[in-house]
Amino acid sequence: MAEICYENETMMIETTATVVKKATTTTRRRERSSSQAARRRRMEIRRFKFVSGEQEPVFVDGDLQRRRRRESTVAASTSTVFYETAKEVVVLCESLSSTVVALPDPEAYPKYGVASVCGRRREMEDAVAVHPFFSRHQTEYSSTGFHYCGVYDGHGCSHVAMKCRERLHELVREEFEADADWEKSMARSFTRMDMEVVALNADGAAKCRCELQRPDCDAVGSTAVVSVLTPEKIIVANCGDSRAVLCRNGKAIALSSDHKPDRPDELDRIQAAGGRVIYWDGPRVLGVLAMSRAIGDNYLKPYVISRPEVTVTDRANGDDFLILASDGLWDVVSNETACSVVRMCLRGKVNGQVSSSPEREMTGVGAGNVVVGGGDLPDKACEEASLLLTRLALARQSSDNVSVVVVDLRRDT
């Protein structure tokens, strides 16, 4: 009897387990089916109709509340992501704050004008370069810029002047960053420039009308008068007979001295080196070169040297403008006359009287011998002044190329 009861109890337990298992399986199937149906409803494309105007689409199935709940959930998660991203951006900006370079104040850009004309010469051998902010000095709140301008008067051919135009400002920047002494850095810059020109001639890398046939290329050289303008100083380095003139309180002040063979100290130096100055259409080194210093002219070394004379002038409130020009201007126009012409232009007394397209009258303007860096445009008044000086030189029968740079130094304009 006990065995029958035990067997019945065992069968009942197995039957109950089977029923529970079937019920559980059925429930899971129903839950899975319900979940799949819900998923299909969520993923199916809702039919909606457009209404005129800017109203939102109206859903036909009346599921707007569920849609809004989903949108609020997405918006919350998006806000969280945006907040985290914003925090990362802030941290990144804080980490980079020490490396951010302040842009120069637009008012700090120099006002200048350039004119370079072939004049009565058959070939254009002058070159001009202007590089605003060619060297920058970063402070905590601003970027102080140094401005560079230079005039190069070539002789024998144009390739030395062109090389100076392309390279000398880079050498000046490199040397000044290595040693802040302007006189030493300028001297090293000119020496390196001279060595590069000599190497250029020896290697035959330049392509020009002298055809690199020695000794023709050894007879090619260029003057160089360059100026670096800082907020406190006017630095001028000169090698040759181009010139820099400052107008201060209406008076002309020469910031360079022409290197002519008959200048007493230059004559003594040439003779001490074993050279001679022969008067042939004016004083000339060995009767050939009308200047005692130049970049290049390898065949006249050591009598003709490339070492520049450097002047450093403190800027003052009375500074009006600076003129750099080749001897094509200074041979026929005095310092005082040149300053008077520029002063009239800057005061607007000749505004509109100078043609804006001088190429039709003067060969060489815009002929590719002028390089301007920094992305800014020349000042109209300074441009008119430089162009008027070239016209004055031609009117006074200048027989040379004429190149002029005018820089406005007034602080209140």
Swiss-Prot record:
PROSITE patterns, per database record: PPM_2 (PS51746)
Induction: By abscisic acid (ABA). Induced during leaf senescence. Induced by osmotic stress.
Superkingdom, natural source: Eukaryota
Annotated positions binding Mn(2+) 2: D153, D327, D400
The protein's name in its UniProt record: Probable protein phosphatase 2C 78
GO BP: chloroplast organization; leaf senescence; negative regulation of abscisic acid-activated signaling pathway; response to abscisic acid; response to water deprivation; stomatal movement
Species this protein is from: Arabidopsis thaliana
EC number: 3.1.3.16
Taxonomic lineage of the native organism: Eukaryota, Viridiplantae, Streptophyta, Embryophyta, Tracheophyta
GO cellular component terms listed in the entry, alphabetical order: cis-Golgi network membrane; cytosol; Golgi apparatus; nucleus
Binding site for Mn(2+) 1: D153, G154
Cofactor: record remark: Binds 2 magnesium or manganese ions per subunit.
Catalytic activity: O-phospho-L-seryl-[protein] + H2O = L-seryl-[protein] + phosphate; O-phospho-L-threonyl-[protein] + H2O = L-threonyl-[protein] + phosphate
Alphabetic keyword roster: Golgi apparatus, Hydrolase, Magnesium, Manganese, Metal-binding, Nucleus, Protein phosphatase
Region (Disordered): 21-40
InterPro entries: PP2C, PPM-type-like_dom_sf, PPM-type_phosphatase-like_dom
GO function terms (MF aspect): metal ion binding; protein serine/threonine phosphatase activity
Chief localisation class: Golgi
Function: Acts as a negative regulator of abscisic acid (ABA) signaling for stomatal closure in leaves, and controls water loss during leaf senescence. Activated by the NAC029/NAP transcription factor during ABA signaling in senescing leaves. Functions as a negative regulator of osmotic stress and ABA signaling. Acts as a negative regulator of response to drought.
Gene: SAG113
Knockout consequences: Delayed senescence. Increased sensitivity to abscisic acid (ABA).
